[in-house]
Each structure stands twice: as structure tokens, then as C-alpha cells.
């Protein structure tokens, strides 16, 4: 497989007034994909990719941004040909798709940022939607009685995301050197499944996650310490295929550290990864024949964990 691609573009920045700006751009993408081997063909693809990026400083503390942009996802050449699946003991080969097309989407994005008084932190919220066309998921490419699936274009799909972040210094409780950060992300998506004919989430699409962290500097002791907590919302992290279905679930992931400077500015740092000793699990449902027949043949559950990882580091100039 060989691809030749050209992307001429034009960009213009508009300063509408001291508080408003608008960036516009237009990219023209032309690509030619040539396939040779068991299957020979040459195909051309053209895309216009406009972008409108509007920014408005409502006040020195409040900023708004609105973005509309068209993006194109490039094809993975591996998806054109059959490949060996070393991770599946029951299926040796993943089929390819000679007629695969690039998929594209429109991104509608709104972001608001508020800088807290007395420079103690920032709160931001980002909400956006992606409207996909020629969306790529696995499709049925069976021949005769031999079941097979490959990556293919299945039509339209939509995704919505709300992402809220905070970063705050705890001045109001007399701890100006304590920085607390949070992030909450809520996500949903919808596409029509080519195997079951149902509306479902995108493959490997998580529902969201919650993150919390802090770092406390104590200059008088020449010390700092911190912790980060990351928890993915379980559910919907699923992969659909022609004869099986897989879901992933996992425990929160926690890291912590403490660092001290001594002996001519030498750093002594102790880190702990996976402090909660969490595990990640995969559940797999293997069906006899096509998944639409819902004849369960095998259920498999695998869990693994790395255990806690402790690290002690000494660094400095000697």
C-alpha cells in the first residue's frame, strides 16, 4: 500500500477588537492510495477542512472560546490486509478491507475559563460534540460459512463530552503552598452496531473519569509531597466483534511521593505507584456462530495487576 498526500492551506488571524479574536483556516487535502498485490486498485480522496476559532476575553478573569473544525483521520495501512492476531488463541487471523475509506468528523467545541480572585487558581469547563461520518468500526466480511470481520466504514456516529477542571491554591485556609487539582470528565457516544443492529457506544469508549491530586511544598523544611487519584467510570468500555464481545473494568490508580532536599541541594525522592494495589479485568463473551444469534459458547474473565511499585531516587550534582 502506498499513499501520496498533498495539503495546501491558508490561515488568517483577525483581531476584531482588543478583547475578541478570530482565527480562520482552510486546508485542502488530496490523497492517492495505490494498492498492489492480491488486489490492485488506485483510489483518490479529497477533503476540505475548514476551521473557525473564536476567542473572547469577557473580563481579565473570564475567557470564552468557541471552535468549529473539520478533521480527517488517516487510514492505518494494517487495516487493508489480513494480519495474525497473537492475542486471541481462538482466532489466528484478522481480515483486511481493501475498500476502507478515511473517516472524518466535525468538532463543535465550547470552552469557558474563570481565573479565581487573588490568583488562587483556575476553573475551566469544556463541552464538545463530534459528529462522525464514514465512522470506522469492525464490520462483517464473511464469505460463505467462514465468519470474518475487518475494520470498515459504518456511517454516522456522535460523541458528547463534558470536561471540568480546577486548580486551586489553598490560600483561604492559610496553606498557599498547597495546590489541589481536580478533573471530572463525562462522556457518551452513539453509533449503530453493524453486527447486532442496536445503538451502542463506540468501541473502547469510556464513560468518563474522575481525577484528584495535590502537591504541598514546605519551603522551611525543604520538602514537598503529593498524591494523585485517577478513577475511570466503569461500563461501556466494550469491543464488539462478529463472534465475541469484550468489556474492561478496573480499580482506581493512585500514586504518591515525598521529596526532601538536603546535603548541598541533593534530592531524595520516594515514589509509590499503584498505591491502592488495583487490578484491571477483562470479561469476554465468545459466541457460537454470529453474535446476533446470541448462543453463548464461552465466558472468560482475566484480571491482572502490577502490584505496588516503590522507587527511591537520589539526584544532584556531585
Region roles according to the model:
Residues 17-21, 57-61, 105, 116-119, ...:
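Outer-membrane beta-barrel channels and translocator barrels
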Residues 3-38, 45-55, 175-186, 226-232:
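Surface-exposed extracellular loop regions of Gram-negative outer-membrane beta-barrel proteins
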Amino acid at each position: 500500500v502506498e499513499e501520496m498526500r498533498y495539503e495546501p492551506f491558508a490561515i488568517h488571524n483577525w483581531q476584531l477588537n482588543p478583547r475578541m479574536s478570530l482565527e480562520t483556516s482552510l486546508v485542502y487535502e488530496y490523497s492517492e492510495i495505490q494498492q498492489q498485490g492480491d488486489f490492485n486498485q488506485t483510489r483518490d480522496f479529497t477533503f476540505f477542512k475548514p476551521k473557525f476559532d473564536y476567542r473572547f476575553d469577557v473580563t481579565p478573569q473570564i475567557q470564552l472560546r468557541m471552535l468549529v473544525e473539520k478533521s480527517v483521520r488517516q487510514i492505518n495501512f494494517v487495516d487493508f490486509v489480513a494480519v495474525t492476531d497473537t492475542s486471541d488463541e481462538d482466532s489466528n487471523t484478522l481480515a483486511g478491507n481493501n475498500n476502507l475509506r478515511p473517516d472524518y468528523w466535525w468538532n463543535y467545541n465550547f470552552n469557558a475559563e474563570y481565573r479565581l480572585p487573588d490568583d488562587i487558581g483556575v476553573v475551566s469547563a469544556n463541552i464538545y460534540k463530534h459528529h462522525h461520518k464514514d465512522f470506522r468500526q469492525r464490520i462483517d466480511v464473511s464469505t460463505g460459512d467462514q465468519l470474518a470481520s475487518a475494520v470498515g466504514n459504518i456511517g454516522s456516529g456522535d460523541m458528547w463530552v463534558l470536561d471540568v477542571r480546577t486548580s486551586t491554591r489553598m490560600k483561604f485556609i492559610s496553606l498557599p503552598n498547597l495546590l489541589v487539582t481536580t478533573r471530572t470528565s463525562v462522556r457518551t457516544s452513539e453509533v449503530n452496531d453493524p453486527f447486532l443492529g442496536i445503538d451502542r457506544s463506540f468501541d473502547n469508549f469510556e464513560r468518563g473519569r474522575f481525577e484528584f491530586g495535590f502537591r504541598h511544598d514546605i519551603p522551611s523544611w525543604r520538602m514537598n509531597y503529593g498524591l494523585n487519584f485517577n478513577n475511570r467510570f466503569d461500563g461501556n468500555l466494550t469491543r464488539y466483534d462478529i463472534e465475541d464481545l469484550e468489556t474492561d473494568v478496573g480499580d482506581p490508580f493512585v500514586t504518591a511521593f515525598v521529596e526532601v532536599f538536603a546535603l548541598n541541594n541533593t534530592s531524595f525522592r520516594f515514589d509509590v505507584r499503584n498505591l491502592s494495589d488495583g487490578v484491571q479485568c477483562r470479561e469476554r463473551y465468545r459466541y457460537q456462530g454470529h453474535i446476533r444469534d446470541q448462543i453463548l459458547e464461552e465466558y472468560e474473565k482475566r484480571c491482572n495487576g502490577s502490584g505496588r511499585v516503590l522507587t527511591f531516587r537520589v539526584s544532584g550534582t556531585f
